[in-house]
Amino acid sequence: LENTMEAKAQQLGFTTKVVVKAKYTPYGLNENSSYFSWKGNYYTLDQLKTEYLKHSDGSGLKVDLPIFLKKAGIMTQEQFDGDQDTKNSVVASLSEGATATQLNAKTGIIGRFCAVRYYHESVCYYDVLIRHDQNVTEKMALGRYGVVRNNWYHLELQSVSGPGTPWIPDPSDPDNPTPPGTDDDEADAYISVKITINPWTYWTQGVDLH
C-alpha cells in the first residue's frame, strides 16, 4: 500500500517500517544466552546480582532494577513498597523459568521502557524505516521516506551495532508508545540496511486482432 507524507510529517507515527526480529548477543557472553542491559552495560543474571549489591540503597540498580521487576510482574507491589531487605531478597532469588515470577520470554516485553532491559535468549527487535529516495541526503526532505506505488523495495542488511529492543516498537501502544512524533531522521538506529527500489517486471505478448 502506498504511504507518502509531506516533509514535516515524516515521523515514526506515520512512516512505513519493517520490524526485524533477530538474536544479538553482546561480546563476552555466550551465544544466544539471556542477558540484561543497563546504562550501556550488559550482564548475565549472576553478574547483575553481583552488580546490584555494589550500589548504595536508594541509588543506581537498587532503584532501577526493582522498578523493572515490578513492571514485569516479578516483584509484587507489596514487595516493592517494602524495605530494602525485601527488595534484596527478591533480586537474590531471581531465576529463569516458565512461571510468572521467573525470567522468561515475556519478561522483557512486559517490563518494557525501563532503565533495565531483559533480553531472553538474545531475542530483540529492530525498526527499519522505509527510505524511498536514497539520493535525498537532506534530513527530512520531501520524498526521503515513504512507500510509493508501483515500486518494489529491497532491503539488504549491512551491519548491526547493538541490540534492538526486547519488545516490538509500536507507536500505537496505548501504555507506552514509541514516541510517534519523533522525526524519522532523529530515531535511534542500531541496524544498518540498504534499501534499493526494484523496477517492475514487464510482460509482453503478441496479439492478433480478428
Regions found by a protein language model. Give the residues of each.
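Extracytoplasmic cysteine-anchoring/structural motifs
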Residues: L1-H210
